[in-house]
Design a protein with these regions (language model features):
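Conserved glycine-rich cofactor-binding loop
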Residues: 14-16
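Conserved glycine-rich Rossmann-like NAD(P)H-binding loop of the short-chain dehydrogenase/reductase
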Residues: 28-45
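The beta1-alpha1 cofactor-binding region of Rossmann-like NAD(H)/NADP(H)-dependent oxidoreductases
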Residues: 39, 60-71, 103
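Substrate-binding pocket helix/loop in short-chain dehydrogenase/reductase
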Residues: 97-98, 102-107
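Active-site helix of classical SDR
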Residues: 121, 157
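Residue(s) in the substrate-gating loop at a strand-loop-helix junction
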Residues: 141
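C-terminal helical subdomain
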Residues: 181, 197-236
Length: 247
């Protein structure tokens, strides 16, 4: 899909991947609706986007409430006259061994990382189908393709998003609506320092958010369903071919 002139909703846009993506989309002439958790940071992103001449609106949203997320998505669809591209980018970490994980932590992680993206998509999908055009971008994680120690809830939510995306792509195959699944690796965002999480096991180098943001641009404009950013597909393929060795 051509980005210029497209009406694009981006969640998780107040920092990290979403903030960088918003600026790239603004530079390409998109009309943007940005959602984020931090109003001050979100306002700063909006200001930077407007310097490119983009039309931008923003909403402070808490995606742990899927009902509210769905309702706001319906309002955005109505107010814009349609959403051409939705980028479900927002995510919440949950680094906790399953022995210490609480039901509330599990429920909240699933709400932010899976249920809200699914319901936002459902809220704008009818309009896309009516126009026979649209792109749904779901930002999952390498943890949605291969398990990570002490991240059972997070991995479960991201595995769910991957499965949802694959089925969504199949169901929409004969329509003009396309689905893109993004699999980021270890990216340098605030997800590593969020309070209420145990220390991360990962200690390697982190990729800049631009690696993923630029890859999402390619995904929107291109034809390929799945995008590993950076390319870690070989590790996921090894896990699939030999799960016992991977574990």
């Amino acid at each position: 899909m051509e980005i210029s002139g497209s009406r694009i909703l981006v969640t998780g846009a107040s920092a990290g991947i979403g903030a960088v993506l918003a600026e790239l989309l603004a530079e390409r002439g998109a009309q943007l609706v940005l959602w984020g958790r931090d109003p001050a940071k979100l306002d700063a992103v909006v200001e930077r986007c407007r310097r490119s001449g983009a039309q931008v609106s923003a909403h402070s949203v808490e995606l742990s409430d899927p009902d509210a997320a769905e309702q706001l998505a319906r309002e955005v669809e109505r107010d814009l006259g349609g959403v051409d591209v939705v980028v479900n980018n927002a995510a919440s970490p949950m680094r906790r061994r399953v022995q210490q994980l609480t039901v509330d932590e599990l429920r909240s992680t699933m709400a932010v990382n899976f249920e809200s993206p699914a319901r936002v998509t459902m809220a704008v999908l009818a309009g896309m189908l009516e126009r026979d055009s649209g792109v749904i971008v779901n930002v999952s994680s390498f943890g949605g393709r291969a398990a990570i120690p002490a991240e059972a809830a997070y991995c479960a939510s991201k595995f769910a998003l991957c499965g949802w995306s694959e089925s969504l792509a199949m169901d929409l195959w004969h329509t003009g609506v396309r689905v893109r699944l993004i699999i980021p690796g270890a990216i340098d965002t605030d997800i590593w320092g969020r309070p209420g999480n145990d220390p991360a096991h990962f200690s390697g180098d982190l990729e800049p958010p631009s690696t993923v943001a630029e890859g999402i641009i390619v995904a929107i404009e291109g034809e390929r369903f799945e995008h590993y950013l950076p390319d870690m597909s070989a590790v996921a393929e090894f896990k699939t071919s030999s799960i016992d060795d991977y574990l």
